C-alpha cells in the first residue's frame, strides 16, 4: 500500500509540475507570473525533475525505486510553482519563507541520502546551493528587471529560514534513520 501511495503521489507531483508550468506560460502576463521568469525556469525545472530517475537508472539498478525521496525532491519544485499559480507569493508577504525552508531542508535530506554524507556536510551543501539560488534570484532581478526579491530583508530572511529548514529536516531524517535502524552515513 505504501508503494502504491508513493507511486500515485509521484505521478501527481510530476503532473502538477507540467500543469503549473503550462499555467505560467499560457498566462505569462497575469500578475501571478509577470516579471518572474517562470517560463525560463520551466526550461530548467523539467529536466531537473528527471534527475533522480536518471541517477537510479545509471547507479541503483536492482534496488527498489526510491519514490519517497523522489517525491521529496519533486515537492521542492511543486511548492514553488504552486505558490505562483495560487497567487500565494503576492497574497501573503512572507509565503516565500515556506518554500525556502522546505527546499533547503529537503535538499539537506537528499544530499545526506544520495551522497551518503554526514548530516553536517549535507547541511553545508544544501546551504551553499541555497545561497547560490538566492544570489541568482537577486541578480536576475538586478540584471534582467525581474521581480523575485522584495529587498535585502527578503534575501536575509530566506537564507535564515533555509538554515532552519536544514536543521529541522536534517534532525528529522537522522531520527527516522536511527528509529528504523537503517544504515548509511548520516
Would you name each region that the model predicts?
Residues 2-102, 109:
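"…centered on the first transmembrane helix and the immediately adjacent amphipathic helix/loop
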Residues 3, 73, 127-130, 151:
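Generic alpha-helical structural signal
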Residues 5-9, 129, 157:
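Physicochemical signature of membrane-embedded alpha-helices that form the seven-helix bundle of GPCRs
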Residues 82-138:
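Membrane-proximal helix-loop-helix units in multi-pass membrane proteins
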Residues 87-96, 131, 135-167:
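Interfacial helix-loop-helix junctions of multi-pass membrane proteins
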Residues 102-117, 142-148, 163-176:
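Membrane-interfacial alpha-helical segments at the cytosolic side of multi-pass membrane proteins
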Residues 174-185:
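Membrane-interface capping segments at transmembrane-helix boundaries
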Amino acid at each position: 500500500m505504501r508503494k502504491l501511495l508513493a507511486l500515485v503521489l509521484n505521478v501527481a507531483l510530476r503532473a502538477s509540475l507540467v500543469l503549473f508550468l503550462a499555467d505560467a506560460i499560457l498566462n505569462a502576463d497575469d500578475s501571478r507570473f509577470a516579471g518572474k521568469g517562470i517560463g525560463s525556469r520551466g526550461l530548467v525545472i523539467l529536466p531537473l525533475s528527471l534527475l533522480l530517475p536518471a541517477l537510479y537508472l545509471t547507479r541503483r539498478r536492482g534496488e527498489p525505486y526510491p519514490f519517497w525521496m523522489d517525491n521529496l525532491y519533486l515537492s521542492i519544485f511543486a511548492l514553488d510553482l504552486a505558490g505562483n499559480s495560487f497567487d500565494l507569493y503576492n497574497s501573503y508577504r512572507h509565503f516565500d519563507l515556506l518554500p525556502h525552508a522546505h527546499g533547503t531542508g529537503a535538499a539537506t535530506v537528499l544530499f545526506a541520502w544520495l551522497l551518503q554524507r554526514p548530516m553536517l556536510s549535507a547541511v553545508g551543501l544544501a546551504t551553499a546551493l541555497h545561497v547560490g539560488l538566492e544570489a541568482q534570484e537577486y541578480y536576475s532581478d538586478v540584471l534582467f528587471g525581474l521581480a523575485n526579491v522584495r529587498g535585502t530583508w527578503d534575501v536575509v530572511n530566506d537564507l535564515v529560514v533555509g538554515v532552519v529548514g536544514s536543521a529541522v529536516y536534517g534532525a528529522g531524517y537522522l531520527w527516522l534513520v536511527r528509529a528504523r535502524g537503517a544504515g548509511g552515513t548520516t
